[in-house]
Amino acid sequence: MTHEERIRAAWQGRISGCLLGKPVEMISMREGPQGLNTFLQDSGSLPLRNYVNYMEHELLRGANKRCCLGMMERAEVDDDITYLVLALMMMEQYGLDLSTDDVARSWINL
């Protein structure tokens, strides 16, 4: 496997992982592990072998809802992925001289 193929596979894995967890991100944060397990069980998503099935839930809406199995049309914007891309851009621009001011300006100019 070439270096380019490895980097591409790493990005695909990272984006796929973010999409896999996006539907239940708020459920797990607000309701904890038990709430997450209950949702996954009730939605028929366990054992987890694919993307999460859609089921009505007050915390499952917008982009999170669009990341459910059968509802995806594209990779939705994700703050974790945005941060990784921005971090790469900042390292390319500032290198080891990167400062907290550079980070603040980069976020504002994004």
Named regions from a protein language model:
Residues 1-110:
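Structured, active/binding-site neighborhoods that engage oxygen-rich ligands
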